[in-house]
């Protein structure tokens, strides 16, 4: 038997693919059993320093380490991985080792360092091969990742170092790459919404035209020149991360990073999960803690200087918002509200709330009652902290005109979606009949598809279908929207478009009732096209 561990997302057994990023709830319940162990690690890691006292250090490190232990660290070739990936890997591999004797394991390390998987496998077998391993990059990341992160943000701060004296009560936090320039998440469609203003008043916050600012966060280096140009052209009431960061503090922490913490030794080598957590914790201390401390103390100082009263995030997973929430739990002098940019369903990656973990905002805004029930019943969110409220992206599309006789294909880069389109458009009689009835076709790729070799090839093939116009932006609500399970389909559905999902998993993705989902699920494009034509008769 050949078992290939592909990055840490998949295991391939004789070419059959098994996903490691599903089945998240059992691992997170298991992680709950180790919260006391993590608290002990945190307590033993403190070294007396000039930056932060022990009790606040423990509060910060405990909650941020859990953030990285739960969420995927997508830095290239990082040697850190989330607990649920490790748990699912161990469960699957243990089953294989029990049932099979002749096994060859292949570690595919093209994008991430999965040496930890290899060390675990060596306890049971020597039939381990590694491919696509980049030893130079792995060495650099293993030894210098933390310094590189600090230097990267310090250089950004040096280049973008303007004084911003704009004063405001409410800070909105969202993603630069997705929403700068289009304000599709935070914009007037939300700020002028009376229901949203009413919601804020429940927290004693009054929203006006001049008492808020939007922080656009960007952590990667993709399109960095454009980001720098936008920094110097942005509105006064817009903030970038560099407006928050304290340059002197950053250099001080970099030069004294070894004086902030001490490495923690492991005493119990019998528990594999403890060994994993311990390894990830020491990686966190070395490579993440310096920039975490810099960001946190900069945020703390900025909030105190500007007297911010409320912080609203597009997601509680946005790292800057998460740090703001940690600060709120510590000082209790601001309010935090989070929308649900992340999709919440039964595979939601979130540690259940308990006395040992309660790093959630004052208010979590969700899409529907099913999601609210899930958070309360399964993840132990307090009832008074979860409110059903329209996602700003739903409100955004309502300002655009509806364009009749239009059919929009929303892509996520799935091969089966491209194949379905290619096969359907070979039926020229069907397509021409739709065109004769006045219909036009649009195809909107996901922005990430332009970075993917497969999608680039498929988009080139799609250009040969003259009936379809490929678009990157959208300034109308189409009459029909079709795709697999994209969030945009759900957004346009809420804006009045007649939307259809071609993937049955979309029901679980968006937590829709059976009866409701049947209205929007179809098996293939031809089924939808014939429905459209039947309505024309």
Curated annotation (Swiss-Prot):
Stated name of the protein: Uncharacterized protein MJ1060
């Amino acid at each position: 038997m050949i078992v290939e561990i592909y990055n840490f997302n998949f295991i391939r057994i004789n070419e059959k693919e098994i996903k490691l990023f599903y089945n998240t709830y059992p691992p997170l319940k298991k992680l709950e059993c180790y919260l006391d162990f993590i608290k002990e690690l945190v307590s033993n890691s403190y070294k007396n320093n000039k930056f932060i006292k022990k009790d606040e250090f423990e509060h910060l490190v405990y909650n941020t380490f859990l953030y990285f232990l739960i969420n995927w660290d997508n830095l290239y070739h990082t040697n850190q991985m989330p607990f649920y990936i490790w748990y699912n890997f161990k469960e699957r591999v243990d089953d294989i080792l029990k049932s099979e004797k002749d096994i060859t394991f292949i570690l595919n390390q093209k994008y991430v360092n999965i040496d930890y998987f290899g060390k675990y496998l060596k306890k049971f077998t020597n039939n381990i091969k590694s491919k696509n391993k980049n030893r130079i990059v792995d060495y650099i990341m293993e030894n210098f990742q933390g310094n590189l992160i600090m230097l990267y943000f310090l250089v950004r701060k040096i280049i973008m170092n303007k004084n911003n004296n704009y004063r405001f009560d409410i800070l909105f936090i969202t993603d630069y790459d997705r929403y700068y320039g289009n304000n599709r998440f935070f914009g007037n469609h939300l700020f002028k919404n009376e229901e949203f203003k009413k919601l804020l008043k429940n927290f004693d916050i009054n929203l006006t035209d001049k008492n808020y600012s939007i922080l656009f966060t960007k952590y990667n280096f993709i399109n960095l020149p454009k980001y720098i140009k936008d920094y110097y052209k942005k509105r006064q009431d817009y903030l970038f991360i560099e407006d928050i960061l304290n340059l002197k503090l950053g250099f001080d922490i970099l030069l004294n990073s070894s004086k902030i913490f001490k490495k923690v030794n492991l005493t119990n080598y019998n528990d594999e999960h403890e060994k994993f957590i311990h390894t990830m914790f020491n990686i966190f201390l070395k490579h993440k803690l310096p920039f975490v401390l810099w960001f946190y103390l900069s945020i703390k100082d900025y909030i105190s200087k500007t007297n911010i009263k409320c912080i609203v995030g597009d997601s509680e997973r946005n790292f800057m918002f998460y740090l703001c929430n940690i600060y709120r739990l510590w000082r209790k002098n601001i309010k935090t509200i989070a929308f649900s940019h992340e999709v919440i369903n039964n595979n939601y990656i979130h540690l259940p709330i308990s006395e040992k973990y309660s790093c959630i905002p004052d208010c979590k805004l969700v899409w529907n009652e099913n999601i609210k029930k899930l958070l309360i019943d399964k993840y132990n969110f307090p009832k008074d902290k979860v409110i059903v409220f329209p996602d700003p992206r739903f409100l955004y599309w309502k300002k655009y005109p509806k364009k009749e006789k239009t059919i929009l294909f929303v892509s996520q880069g799935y091969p089966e979606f491209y194949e379905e389109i290619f096969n359907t458009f070979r039926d020229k009689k069907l397509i021409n009949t739709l065109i004769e009835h006045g219909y036009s076709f649009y195809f909107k790729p996901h922005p990430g598809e332009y970075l993917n070799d497969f999608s680039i090839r498929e988009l080139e093939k799609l250009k040969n279908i003259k009936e379809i116009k490929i678009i990157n932006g959208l300034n109308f609500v189409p009459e029909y929207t079709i795709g697999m399970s994209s969030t945009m389909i759900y957004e346009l559905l809420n804006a009045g478009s007649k939307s259809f999902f071609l993937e049955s998993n979309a029901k679980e993705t968006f937590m829709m009732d059976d009866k409701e989902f049947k209205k929007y699920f179809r098996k293939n494009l031809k089924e939808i096209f014939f429905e459209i034509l039947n309505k024309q008769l």
